[in-house]
């Protein structure tokens, strides 16, 4: 049963094995984690613009083979629209991709795992954990 949705930075920490505590938590929670297709897009973008795109894309492919990737769907879009409006009213916006990942996690009732808790904690009804 899925419990956690990993943010992009936690995926990168896991891939690089730094800090080691993130990899340990990743290994302990096999079968309970997923990423959003939005996170996959961010990982691919980072690899494509890197100095070694082929190598980095292969690493991402290996990582993604060990975790569920959830498609961004209508429920996620609905939650994202609500989050964007709530944060705009408060004058406390977050980045568009973080809004989408937050909306996706909230729509599925998942805990977002991130080291960027300051951004995600602004989102009502979203639970966060920092494994770093």
Curated annotation (Swiss-Prot):
Keywords in alphabetical order: Endonuclease, Hydrolase, Magnesium, Metal-binding, Nuclease, Plasmid, Toxin-antitoxin system
Activity regulation behaviour: Inhibited by EDTA.
Enzyme Commission number(s) from the entry: 3.1.-.-
The UniProt record lists the keyword Hydrolase: yes
Chain residues that bind Mg(2+): 7, 98
Recorded family membership: Belongs to the PINc/VapC protein family.
Description of how the protein assembles with itself and partners: Forms a hetero-octamer (4 VapB and 4 VapC) complex with antitoxin VapB. The complex binds 2 different sites in the vapBC promoter, probably via VapB dimerization.
Role, per record: Toxic component of a type II toxin-antitoxin (TA) system. A tRNA-(fMet) endonuclease, it cleaves both charged and uncharged tRNA-(fMet) between positions 38 and 39 at the anticodon stem-loop boundary. Does not cleave tRNA(Met), tRNA(Arg2), tRNA(His), tRNA(Leu), tRNA(Phe) tRNA(Thr1), tRNA(Tyr) or tRNA(Val). Overexpression in E.coli inhibits translation, leads to loss of cell growth and degradation of tRNA(fMet); these effects are neutralized by expression of cognate antitoxin VapB. The VapB/VapC complex probably regulates transcription of its own promoter. Ectopic overexpression in E.coli induces the YoeB toxin, but this is not the cause of VapC toxicity.
Name of the featured protein: tRNA(fMet)-specific endonuclease VapC
